[in-house]
């Protein structure tokens, strides 16, 4: 069989693709979408709450993520404060024992530490301080917050003058309707503190 040159065969109509995915349905990895942001204009707030979560997002999103840049306001500017979280209005200053937390902590001068808290009224996600103007940064993932067949698991990563990685369990199978953030010692949030909530769509 003779070999025929395409240059002489009259094949002039063709399509050129620059991607190996041509003709195939693209597969896009999941991406978190910004849902809400709260920026505090003044330092008179001690609790920041995101509400109506299940009714607004439960049918669309599988996981929630919070990204936080915050600091506890302090009269003397030299007070350290833990950042804590509670859900569905259960916990916080209202007391209770629905949360259990485990943290790995890296302190610059003291090395590594492990901390555990059980049967507390909040989940502990990290550390914020008013000392020297330091702000705390946090990433908080709430896994399957709208499931009603298992307890809710939360994982967190935070950084300030020390770094922490941890997780906690909220011992309740109810769908999450609200998430609240609060510093301990009844400290208010510093002006300019920012908390953004993202959602990862269900498959």
Predicted regions located by residue number:
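Surface-exposed molecular-recognition determinants
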Residues: 2-203
